[in-house]
């Protein structure tokens, strides 16, 4: 081993981990205060640089906010103290590895401005020995990993205000699309709540209204038969539509619609007259008028709901 005089060029890098020569305590009379002889008398001084005034001590951040305190204290938008403390914890973990390989822990100080102490190496090694579910960071960082990638159980039990606002977006979109699909299947346009939630409901209602206006008074088409046998296709043409059951001919529907246009409720004499003229039973005419009244009521309700949800129209 070389003499101390030949170790002069390395004296400036004496406290860096890359230095291969280590100086014991008794070699210098003016030894710095951060290299004491006994581990129990190490001072707990955290001297950070002046550009990080808001950083908390490493030990407090480690055992108070990462390990013991619940996750509700962590807000997604805070000051940058958590970022700095996380970096220092990573440096602390990196500095601890050479000391476990046989390097004395007293000389592993970086500089007089940024000093990293290891007051409790056993507790710290246990804290970082368990790797989290992402395979790189410790288990303490699992809460941030789950928040970033949206685990279902984390989204269900999250207390972050940002996550609550963020999860309203996909849920509202899913509810809007589900309401639109259900409306297309049952023949009704989307409700006013889905109109307010997204543009899908407005498009569905607009398509329904255009289709209704395209049929001239729903008079001469077989699609305008009894309401309980009707299955509308809606605005989406990609869905498979069931073949409509229509027990009435076009001539019968035209005459029934003409009578319904003059009087919504039909009396018994007129009903018997229609049944004889159209070769239908009295019960068939009666049921057709009942279904046609329900259909008209539903059309008026949907039209009122559509225009009340869109005040500009």
UniProtKB/Swiss-Prot annotation:
Alphabetized SMART domains for the sequence: HOX
Gene Ontology MF terms in the entry: DNA binding; DNA-binding transcription factor activity, RNA polymerase II-specific; sequence-specific double-stranded DNA binding
GO terms of biological process kind: anterior/posterior pattern specification; bone development; branching involved in ureteric bud morphogenesis; cartilage development involved in endochondral bone morphogenesis; cell development; chondrocyte development; chondrocyte differentiation; developmental growth
Main location: nucleus
Keyword DNA-binding in annotation: yes
DNA-binding region: 241-300
Listed GO CC annotations: nucleoplasm; protein-containing complex; protein-DNA complex; transcription regulator complex
SUPFAM superfamilies: Homeodomain-like
Gene3D superfamilies attached to this UniProt entry: Homeodomain-like (1.10.10.60)
Listed InterPro entries: DUF3528, HD, HD_metazoa, Homeobox_CS, Homeodomain-like_sf
Stretch list, region Disordered: 188-246
Keyword vocabulary terms for this entry: Developmental protein, DNA-binding, Homeobox, Nucleus, Transcription, Transcription regulation
Source species, domain of life: Eukaryota
Localization annotation: Nucleus
Membership in a protein family: Belongs to the Abd-B homeobox family.
Role, per record: Sequence-specific transcription factor which is part of a developmental regulatory system that provides cells with specific positional identities on the anterior-posterior axis.
Name recorded for this polypeptide: Homeobox protein Hox-A11
